[in-house]
From Swiss-Prot:
The active site is at K25, D152. ATP binds at P110, V111, A112, G113, G114, M115, A116, G117, G118, S119, A120. Belongs to the GHMP kinase family. IspE subfamily. GO terms for molecular function: 4-(cytidine 5'-diphospho)-2-C-methyl-D-erythritol kinase activity; ATP binding. Catalyzes the phosphorylation of the position 2 hydroxy group of 4-diphosphocytidyl-2C-methyl-D-erythritol. This is 4-diphosphocytidyl-2-C-methyl-D-erythritol kinase.
Amino acid sequence: MFASDGNAATQWMPTGSVTVQVPGKINLYLAVGDCCDNGYHELVTVFHAVSLVDQVTVRNADVLSLGLVGEGANHVPTDEHNIAWRAAELMAEHVGRAPDVSIMIDKSIPVAGGMAGGSADAAAVLVAMNSLWELSLPRRDLCMLAAKLGSDVPFALHGGTALGTGRGEELATVLSRATFHWVLAFADSSLLTPAVYTEFDRLRDVGNPPRLAEPGPVLAALVAADPEQLAPLLGNELQAAAVSLDPALRCALRAGMEAGALAGIVSGSGPTCAFLCASATSAIDVGAQLAGAGVCRTVRVATGPVPGARVVHAPMSRGLNDM
């Protein structure tokens, strides 16, 4: 297919679609600095991508559009208030084109659940448009665009396990060959990240929660591939704020531990709770008991680490149209 804006030379526009699979994340360790003058908090965190994924399909279109299906889709905006929409505009601006694509997101990552589902979708749009438009932008350019969109977007590109600093966008790969087994408990409620940070600042002013130790032991446990070594080291300084805003999380955390998890933690700003298990069999057992305990909306079993945003369906060959 060829197209022209009436002024520029006719250019090639690939047809077809691209689907990108992108994982949610949990924070194995999250230490929060004091609020800076710019309103942000400096972070030290250990990101861990898990096998709960969204699928994002991007096609060429006459105008930019966005649709969603799946987990929490009715609660997500489908206009410029959605970070995936802004990702399409940013990519198009970067390469000097109009953002004429349709985006369809099939969600499994919970909305406002502390697993960076929106950031994951934005990363997926960048990867999909890079492939669909055959731009061949290098990874460093994608990471630069990702950082402009939000603090969690670069890790959604990166995947695996990584140490994040700054606002979370500065990443260093953590090498771990192990597969860790998780049970994820979705809450009935949602928590907005700004509200959690506001509550965190209030609690810190009165000395709660205590600050975490340095993340070195967490990194060592990951390298050792030992879930029992890792379990007591999981920590999240935002957890107290999340629980303060949603006290029902205490019941979920307690139920997961009583079901046999090695450790439980609120993921990021919450309210999703992540439970580390000793094995795949243990994760299934813990998930079944947690699902029957009536303390959460939905339970998912997942593994990590997994890769970041990646194409799972490449564009169709030139000259071929969609069926």
